[in-house]
């Protein structure tokens, strides 16, 4: 994005996160070691759990209200690409069958719904059901060995599918 936005990159992010989404805390976005002239942006951001929920709600609202961003989200869903991942890939919620933009899509058992998913460090998950106005957030500290792994079906897929 910095390539397209240019020098106003920080101003653009401030407008999106502060004015539109109305985050309550600072958002940190990543940088790479690439030279500045090539753009050193990184797709990851760090936010509080409540601000992640605000971001998910803004994404869902844009999709449903057919804004410019909403049209873009519909387009990336329409043009999603199959993943070339293995069946045994960990974590299990990451076994979605496709992706578009920065989102996981076509989750097992949820294929009939338009669901955008994001996953993060330590097993954190956000699922957004765009058409049924549902958001599921699972906050996790660790996901690096059997001691810390959780039941994906019980905590993510079943509640999201059944609404409980």
State where each predicted segment sits:
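Alpha-helical scaffold elements that line and support the substrate/ligand-binding pocket
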Residues: 1-17, 52-59, 133-136
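Active-site helix/loop module of the DD-peptidase/beta-lactamase fold
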Residues: 3-42, 47, 64-67
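Short alpha-helical "patches" and their helix-cap loops
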Residues: 9-19, 69-74, 150-158
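Active-site Gly/Thr loop motif
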Residues: 24-30, 43, 78-136
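Active-site-proximal alpha-helical segments within enzyme catalytic domains
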Residues: 43-65, 124-140
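C-terminal amphipathic alpha-helical segment
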Residues: 48-93
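Structured C-terminal helix/loop/strand segments within mature extracytoplasmic catalytic/sensor domains
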Residues: 115-164
